[in-house]
């Protein structure tokens, strides 16, 4: 079990590192190809649209097929598309490659989480899923820092080559070390449940709605955060270096990662619902602080408030999904839960791309906070009425 968890952590870390590496440069890359703000939002949504389409299908398939082999396919897609990014010649080609990137994510991340959830002992779901979330946020946190540095020191293409090399390493270790799931007695195969059955579970449905709204709010602002930090004052930006944007994004994600395991232990000991509600309120407050930040430290502090809220809520939320998934089917449950994020990440950037053109860059952060607050309130009432 120990070696399996290690490999799963590495797979998730590498996949999310690749995503994090390109996050501070993708809007700039698209802008260099002549993309508008709305197209930049659409580019972010391409990744999530792909995940929304393929994640539930892969989740159901994983109930009766080898998760190890499917994960290897997903990592291979990641590796290839990383190189293809450097060959983009216009917005349409970049959009297509972003869509393929989402396919790799749809295969890799939910299956790694489902595999880890199946290995989690009862009563330690928060600890195990907090550890997996640590890997996710560590990759996303270090990625922008590396991506910003490589862009400033080398070129816009350099981060994509690094992303491909890291994914190739993860793929190799998956094939060599990760055991076949069917060889483990602790993992039971079952027929794939329907999506309707999964969503008919009231507690899971409340978690699903919270995740949709959380991703909606996050997607509305986070994709434009690098533009807010490094963009010119004419568009409402702060005019800082790309590496500074990468640093702020990284500190936010790394701090979130560092809090995942202790907050996971907290989720195993205390009321998970209350932790989710408190986390949602904190994150919404952080979004509202961003447009009032003018220095590096002020932006950093607002980002840390968002990170603390997200870190508090996520282990408790994924622990609930794990517990309910044992009865429903972990592969399908994790995939549907991941689809919730995709729905929000599709709508969020599209809405923000439109609103930035209408109301300005800075006001979009208030919109993101309001959306996150709405999701928190919706979760509270849905959980009470179940």
Q: How should these model regions be labeled?
A:
Residues 1, 179-209:
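Juxtamembrane intracellular "pre-TM" segments in multi-pass secondary transporters
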Residues 25-37, 223-243:
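Short amphipathic helix-loop junctions that connect adjacent transmembrane helices
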Residues 48-56, 140-141, 253-261, 345-346:
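Residue-level signature of mid-helix packing/kink "hotspots" within the transmembrane helices
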Residues 53-89, 267-273:
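Conserved MFS/SLC helix-loop-helix module at the cytosolic interface between two early adjacent transmembrane helices
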Residues 81, 92-100, 286, 297-305:
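Paired small-residue
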Residues 97-136:
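Cytoplasmic helix-loop-helix junction between adjacent transmembrane helices
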Residues 108-120, 312-325:
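Intracellular juxtamembrane helix-capping segments at the cytosolic ends
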Residues 165-184, 375-383:
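C-terminal membrane-cytosol helix-exit motif in multi-pass small-molecule transporters
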């Amino acid at each position: 079990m120990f070696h399996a968890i290690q490999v799963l952590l590495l797979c998730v870390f590498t996949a999310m590192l690749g995503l994090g590496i390109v996050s501070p440069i993708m809007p700039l890359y698209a802008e260099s190809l002549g993309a508008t703000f709305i197209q930049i939002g659409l580019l972010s949504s391409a990744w999530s649209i792909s995940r929304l389409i393929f994640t539930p299908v892969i989740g159901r398939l994983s109930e009766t097929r080898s998760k190890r082999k499917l994960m290897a396919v997903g990592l291979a897609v990641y590796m290839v598309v990383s190189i293809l990014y450097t060959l983009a010649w216009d917005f349409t080609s970049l959009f297509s490659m972003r869509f393929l990137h989402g396919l790799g994510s749809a295969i890799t991340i939910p299956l790694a989480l489902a595999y880890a959830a199946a290995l989690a002992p009862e009563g330690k779901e928060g600890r195990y899923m907090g550890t997996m979330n640590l890997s996710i946020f560590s990759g996303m946190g270090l990625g922008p820092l590396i991506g910003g540095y490589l862009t400033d020191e080398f070129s816009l293409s350099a981060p994509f080559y690094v992303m491909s090399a890291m994914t190739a390493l993860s793929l190799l270790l998956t094939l060599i070390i990760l055991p076949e799931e069917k060889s483990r007695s602790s993992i039971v195969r079952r027929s794939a449940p329907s999506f309707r059955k999964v969503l008919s579970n009231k507690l899971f449905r409340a978690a699903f709605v919270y995740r949709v709204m959380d991703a909606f709010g996050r997607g509305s602002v986070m994709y434009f955060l690098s533009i807010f930090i490094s963009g010119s004052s004419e568009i409402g930006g702060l005019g800082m270096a790309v590496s500074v944007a990468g640093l702020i994004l990284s500190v936010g994600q790394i701090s979130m990662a560092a809090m995942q395991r202790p907050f996971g232990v907290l989720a195993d000991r205390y009321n998970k619902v209350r932790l989710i509600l408190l986390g949602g309120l904190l994150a919404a407050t952080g979004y509202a602080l961003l447009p009032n930040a003018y220095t590096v430290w002020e932006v950093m502090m607002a980002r840390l408030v968002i990170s603390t809220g997200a870190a508090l809520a996520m282990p408790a939320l994924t622990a609930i999904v794990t517990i309910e998934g044992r009865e429903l089917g972990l592969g399908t449950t994790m995939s549907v839960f991941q689809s919730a994020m995709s729905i929000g990440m599709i709508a969020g950037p599209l809405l923000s791309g439109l609103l930035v053109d209408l109301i300005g860059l800075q006001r979009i952060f208030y919109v993101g906070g309001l959306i996150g607050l709405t999701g928190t309130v919706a979760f509270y009432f849905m959980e009470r009425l179940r």
